[in-house]
Amino acid sequence: MRTLGAMAVMLVVMGTAIFLPFLLRSRDILGGKTMTSHVISVVETSQLLVDNAVYNTMKRNLKKRGVLSPAQLLSFSKLPESTSGAISRAAEIMETSIQVMKREQSQFSTDALSADILATIANLSGCLPFMLPPRCPDTCLANKYRPITGVCNNRDHPRWGASNTALARWLPPVYEDGFSQPRGWNPNFLYHGFPLPPVREVTRHLIQVSNEAVTEDDQYSDFLPVWGQYIDHDIALTPQSTSTAAFWGGVDCQLTCENQNPCFPIQLPSNSSRTTACLPFYRSSAACGTGDQGALFGNLSAANPRQQMNGLTSFLDASTVYGSSPGVEKQLRNWSSSAGLLRVNTLHLDSGRAYLPFASAACAPEPGAPHANRTPCFLAGDGRASEVPALAAVHTLWLREHNRLATAFKAINTHWSANTAYQEARKVVGALHQIITMRDYIPKILGPDAFRQYVGPYEGYNPTVNPTVSNVFSTAAFRFGHATVHPLVRRLNTDFQDHTELPRLQLHDVFFRPWRLIQEGGLDPIVRGLLARPAKLQVQEQLMNEELTERLFVLSNVGTLDLASLNLQRGRDHGLPGYNEWREFCGLSRLDTGAELNKAIANRSMVNKIMELYKHADNIDVWLGGLAEKFLPGARTGPLFACIIGKQMKALRDGDRFWWENSHVFTDAQRQELEKHSLPRVICDNTGLTRVPVDAFRIGKFPQDFESCEEIPSMDLRLWRETFPQDDKCVFPEKVDNGNFVHCEESGKLVLVYSCFHGYKLQGQEQVTCTQNGWDSEPPVCKDVNECADLTHPPCHSSAKCKNTKGSFQCVCTDPYMLGEDEKTCIDSGRLPRASWVSIALGALLIGGLASLSWTVICRWTHADKKSTLLITERVTMESGFRKSQESGISPQKAEVQDAEQEPAYGSRVLLCE
């Protein structure tokens, strides 16, 4: 009995020893003390994982600064600006932190994690500032000009439509783990009993067509798809992951065919002729607080699956011209201009007209051009401006139009500040983007019936409408335009015929080649080709030409990309529900059988191929299903995409407080003038063309379908003249150091609203009002912001030193490190430091000097008892040659040669020891 008792006591002691630490740790975790420190440790570890992956990405890019691969060009085209990049990084740190904690679920009770812990993770990762609602300014200016970021367009929902916020979800996403893993992530995951077909197989069997087999559109010009691409770049950009390497393990996404976040490679069939088994693909960045970031917390997991971010404003606001962040806007403006102009290219002109300025990054080189002479990419409001010359041409048109308008406004209203002229021109350019898109472009895409059904007439601003671009619109529906891209770039002469000196080019010969525009004729030949040559017709069995499926972004023989497969994979990455779910969303019937599918597609051969690949109608990817539908009458889309595009366009219009038709934005007279304007008028005012079609999107023959520019209506800008009297007691300031001001009226009084340039902070009253005694307060001043003092969110990576500059900051590296492409992180350049080269040179000189000294000492010591002579042999030889020539009568040259046979090191100037 005593033995049993002793054993029981021992078991209790052992059990206590084993379980007490865990119980104590659990108590501390539940209490918050240990858990908080553990969370800090996890976030710090995750930050290292993410930053190391980003660092390795930039280091690889630095080593590959020659001809870029297609995957690198795609990453470059989707490179986020600094604010988007910071949010993407924060989201990835937060998501990685949650993944670490998920692996520890066996140790911790996930239900015990509180909202405080979530806030701690969000704050430490850097996500929290982007999740909090912003403060909306309460000045008269807030109703006069739209903010560059779109924030506070809707004052009740300040982030609706703003840049760097999540894309809207019209249906819940479908992820294989319920909150983050894409469709097709797990090879053994079945949908209705079948795996999803590889996207490359879908491309090969259903989408791809040879360049020669395309059918041309007999109604619409090549300007139609180019405008669609341009407008898409105004309202949506989904940044890719900031890293092209896996966060766990750091493997390069271009070198692996395994799914390791953010790598989600496109698998190739086993019989593919390519040397690799897959094409690289990088997942889109998650928006802060979504996906894995929310799944661990019971109160968020059901409502907060992974969302993707839109780096641009959702609004039709000409962000292609002005950017979607203060940093980009600062780069684009000409701050020395008193008329509020945009920057232009200082190196090149197009027959006296401006080009876009250059960005710091080099684009694809001209053949044979030395590395130092490579033409940089163009700098515009959107980073994709250099993708193709046609897109760059449209960007350039609007740069010129802004400067034309701003110059005219300043001449009409000489009292306007530079900022007022800039904002008024920006306001008009934004309105023209809205008019051309909604009046001239969208009705052609939807057809008249669908336009009336889904868009209808404007009935005023509706603050309950969310204008945020939806995920399905950006990732699927509006990508219908890829099926209308022609494989050729046509450049025409002044008679609108093929240019003898500028032959047609295949699309892959113009990707990221701005030198084609600058050195080969400028804008005019490109614009003529867009106006007078047809677009590709979207035919069901000719959906996408091989320039896009086999040669996308190809600059050399190093790899390729496939746009169709990218679109399908992106839809799966974003968790878009299938084709039938979206038909049901739009009030259309589900199509469950091949016979039912044929009613919507009207092509039995294509239906059979679809069912053979997907096995079940509910498995069909929404982009393919919408693309395959037969057109509605007078449209260029089928019923599903007409519904999605129509709903989105109505939301963009009705949910925009600054829509041009809203009563407070323009006067009645100004709206009438704006309605007169058109894309052909913009072309007339900003190119050398003298004849244009009345509708830039309709294909026509020259000259019968073209009108003289004198016949194309234009706006009367005198309607923007301000006539209100200025009180002598309230004189406008001539300038504001490091800032600007605009004026407006509030309760019948003149008000000046001040703002500072990006990088400066306002000190004093933002708004001053004119009273009977003059301005009611002193004007504020703009003080430099010391970004380097921000220790919570330092502007530079820890590898770099932050140096404050006026209005900005600079990240500085120590030799031999150099700044990476984010201009914030120091990357090993792979060369020796300059100091090392200096040390090597000094060392060589020192060794040489010591050797010479040693040689002299040795010579003198060894010949101390002999006659030591230092000979400069060249001189001695010449002297002996002259002596011998005198004695023997031979020439000095011959005597010199004879001596040379006897003298050591003939001709040397080295001092020798004899």
From Swiss-Prot:
It is found in: Membrane. Residues 784-827 form the EGF-like domain. The active site is at H233 (proton acceptor). Pathway: Hormone biosynthesis; thyroid hormone biosynthesis. One of its GO terms (cellular component) is extracellular space. Heme is covalently bound through a H(2)O(2)-dependent autocatalytic process. Heme insertion is important for the delivery of protein at the cell surface. Residues 32-834 are extracellular. This is Thyroid peroxidase. It comes from Rattus norvegicus (Rat). The gene is Tpo.
